[in-house]
Structures are given as structure tokens and as C-alpha cells.
Curated annotation (Swiss-Prot):
Family membership: Belongs to the ENDOU family.
First and last residue of the signal peptide: 1-17
Annotated keywords: Endonuclease, Glycoprotein, Hydrolase, Lyase, Manganese, Metal-binding, Nuclease, RNA-binding, Secreted, Signal
Family matches, as PROSITE patterns: ENDOU (PS51959)
UniProt-recorded name of the protein: Uridylate-specific endoribonuclease D
Top EC class of this enzyme: lyase
Name of the gene encoding the protein in the UniProt record: endou-d
Length: 305
């Protein structure tokens, strides 16, 4: 009799095609306020012990382009952007060293499948392991756990690797891209530079003669590092009309700032703060493919100046 009664109760759902499974648990995450995000960004700024000191980087900005000049592709700078970078000091630091290891792993032209052999997977893991030793990533992890975004540091670590290093296609063809490749390495997509928002990569490209610095269009208000700039440049013959960068920051700082905004303010402008000055980071999710339970990969993230 009880079985018959239960069946009658469920019959309307079965007829209508509705699921009889329990509804998924509702999102229990506490919303992160703008004030909390800005406060945490300030903590990252104060805790970035691996950042460049004032004498570790010397820039030669040369010409400031107007808004009408940035898209012209004109070379207003006769000299290189980076006069000096203290590689012996900065690149010997573990998180920098692990980042540099990753930067030769990618085919920069979209449309070509990315091969990820075991050695490169090991380099990804080594980079993530290293940044998780820093106080910046610890602060980020603790914040996410306190807000219910993740249940543990281990679950956050697993998800961070997937959101940044998981492969997807930007060309409706082979798996040719990832959030990390786009933001930290840079790509050539549809005849233009796409992504490329990491200063270490920019420096190494210019040092090797692959990038030609053209001009700058924005200089942040900060006197020390990290600072924020917007540049115009060419990678081979391909143009970047406006590329924004943290300059002098550590790899863990960049990852933390971008991930904080990506998780809490996806596909939008995210207000953060450094040294008392507010600015915004733009994040984009990759909507054409997902991983896990409908999660989206990083498409892009950069300072919006």
C-alpha cells in the first residue's frame, strides 16, 4: 500500500518529465563585498615579499601615446622598454624560476593543438606547489574558504590548476589555449596579439628581440613596485594596441589578484586596491566549454587602465 501511495505521489512528475531526484544544494557562498575584496588586495600588496625592489627594474618609457595614436602601430620609441632587470636576484626566487620554466611550453599561434607532455605537467605542478607556499596564496585560500567558495585549501588548489591550465579551443578546432597561456604567455589570434599581460614574459620577449616596444599610454600612480602600465607593442609583425601589465610584481601576486577577481567577480570589472589607490581588474570566463560541475575556464584577466 505504501509503495502504491508513493508511486501516485510521484506520478505527476513522471508524466511531466520532471526530475524526481533531489534538487542540487543551493549556493551557500557568502557574497564577497567590494570592501572585502579591496582589503584582501591590499594584503596581497603588503605581503608581496618577492616583488622587485626599486632598483631591480629600470624602464625607459620614452613616448606617451595619446588615445588617437595607440592604434596606429607607429613606433614612437627608438629604444627598448626595459633598460635593466635584476635577473640574478629576481629569477632565482622560486616562484619566478617556476614561472620562467613554463613560458617555453606553448605554441603562441591559436589553431595549433597544445601538446602537454608529462614534463610540462610536472612544471605546472611545481609552479602551483611553489606559489601555494607563499603568504599571498595562503591569504587568498583562507578567504575563499571563509566565504564558502571552497571547502579546503586542497580543493582550491585543484580548481586553480584546472581554471588556469585546463585546455580549450579558441578556434572551434584543436585544444589550443588556456587561461595561463593567454594571460601569462600571450597568443597570436586573428592576426593580432591576444592576451600577454605578464611583465616577465614581456621582458623576455623583448630581450630575445621578438617584441618591439612602441609607446606607453598609461602609467599608474604607484611610486614603487608593483606598478601598472599600458603599452603598445609589436610581437613580430603583430600589433597590441593596448596591453596592461603589473610591473615588478611576483607571479603569486598576479595569480592571486586575477583569481580573486575571477572567482568573486567573473565577467565583470572588479574593484581592488593597492597602496590606498583603487583600480579595476577585468575578468572574462570561457563560455564555450566547461569542466567539473559546469565551471568555466579563465579566458582573460588584466588590469583595466
Amino acid at each position: 500500500m505504501k509503495v502504491y501511495f508513493v508511486f501516485l505521489c510521484l506520478l505527476p512528475s513522471l508524466i511531466s518529465g520532471a526530475s524526481i531526484l533531489p534538487e542540487p544544494r543551493k549556493d551557500v557562498r557568502a557574497s564577497a563585498s567590494n570592501a572585502e575584496i579591496q582589503s584582501l588586495a591590499e594584503q596581497f600588496y603588503a605581503a608581496d615579499t618577492n616583488k622587485a625592489a626599486s632598483g631591480d627594474i629600470t624602464l625607459n618609457l620614452q613616448y606617451k601615446a595619446s588615445s588617437t595614436q595607440t592604434s596606429s602601430g607607429t613606433d614612437f620609441a627608438s629604444q627598448k622598454l626595459f633598460n635593466y632587470v635584476n635577473e640574478a636576484k629576481l629569477f632565482a626566487r622560486p616562484t619566478f624560476a617556476r614561472l620562467v620554466d613554463l613560458l617555453d611550453n606553448y605554441v603562441h599561434t591559436t589553431g595549433t593543438a597544445e601538446s602537454v607532455p608529462t614534463a610540462e605537467v610536472n612544471e605546472q605542478n611545481a609552479f602551483i606547489d611553489e606559489i601555494f607556499k607563499t603568504s599571498i596564496i595562503t591569504k587568498l585560500s583562507d578567504f575563499f574558504i571563509s566565504k564558502g567558495y571552497y571547502s579546503s585549501a586542497a580543493s582550491f588548489k585543484t580548481d586553480l590548476k584546472e581554471m588556469w591550465f585546463g585546455l580549450y579551443t579558441r578556434t572551434s578546432g584543436p585544444l589550443d589555449s588556456s587561461g595561463f597561456e593567454h594571460v601569462f604567455h600571450g597568443e597570436i589570434h586573428k592576426g593580432k596579439i591576444s592576451g600577454l599581460h605578464n611583465w616577465v614574459r614581456l621582458y623576455l620577449l623583448e630581450k630575445s628581440g621578438q617584441v618591439n616596444y612602441l609607446s606607453y599610454s598609461s602609467d599608474g600612480v604607484w611610486n614603487g613596485y608593483p606598478d601598472i602600465y599600458a603599452f603598445q607593442l609589436k610581437w613580430s609583425t603583430y600589433l597590441k594596441t593596448l596591453g596592461s601589465f603589473f610591473i615588478g610584481s611576483s607571479p603569486e601576486f598576479d595569480i592571486a589578484m586575477y583569481t580573486l577577481c575571477y572567482v568573486t567577480r567573473p565577467d565583470s570589472l572588479c574593484s581592488v586596491k593597492m597602496g590606498g589607490s583603487i583600480f579595476q581588474i577585468q575578468t572574462y570566463t570561457w563560455a564555450n566549454s566547461t569542466y567539473g560541475n559546469g565551471k568555466r575556464y579563465v579566458a582573460s584577466s588584466y588590469p583595466n587602465i
